[in-house]
């Protein structure tokens, strides 16, 4: 979910001041949408059978938008599974937002603190890759409401303390699966020397501003998603494609929109005849385990 930090802040403050209520979590677990804490299906080592010679850009992979946004109410929350549960369910793209203050990197969604810091994220990823060395994890790393300090230096310090330098893929070039196994690929969305692949080098569709849950607004969002997915199937194979199915506004909270978009995405993908198509990364809010599994299935 992109946009100015000030706009996000205004939305969150407005939601509190207006006391607006939206459909709450009801422990919904469907093929496309899940706001429970436990995935229905696990796919912890699905990359193991992908040939080493395949480029990571050839892989169709499920991801989550604002991966760690588990707290803060319905306008801030984008997922209900823990990071470890997401990885075990098959999620391989993480969208991590860090706030840099006084040398610390805490996890935030806008003004909402997520009761975690970047070290927690790194430790979970390290533990997962040690248990499943056939896998790779892509991580968009973005500043959220930071001060003016050097975020690059703080990120490097956290990596050295909570992980290890060799965990990272150290190149702007997209690796093959053989090169990427057991690695964390940082998609760098902040200034400074290279830590990995620059986020803005990807072909990205992130039309996150959905003004309401009215049918025409939801349809507009879905057209953006489906159009970019189709573009990924015929696009440059040497470039990674990233499609966000997520969106939000004061009148369209992430969970409410995901309940409408995710079933469409699931129906669209399950109805696709050609399982060899490359869709790239599909980043979602509250994905259902069967939707995750369906995305994985396009690699076989």
PLM-predicted stretches and their roles:
Residues 1-15:
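Classical eukaryotic N-terminal signal peptides for Sec-dependent ER targeting/secretion
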Residues 3, 19-93, 102-131, 136, ...:
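Long, acidic (Asp/Glu-rich), low-complexity accessory segments flanking structured domains
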Residues 72-79, 87, 114, 118, ...:
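Aromatic-acidic/polar surface patches that form glycan- and anion
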Residues 97:
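A motif-centric signal for short, conserved binding hotspots located
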Residues 100, 133-147:
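Active-site groove signature of glycoside hydrolases
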Residues 139, 186, 282:
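A residue-level signal for conserved active-site and pocket-lining positions in enzyme catalytic cores
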Residues 151-156:
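Distinct, well-ordered alpha-helical segments
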Residues 162-274:
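Surface-exposed substrate-engagement region within the catalytic domains
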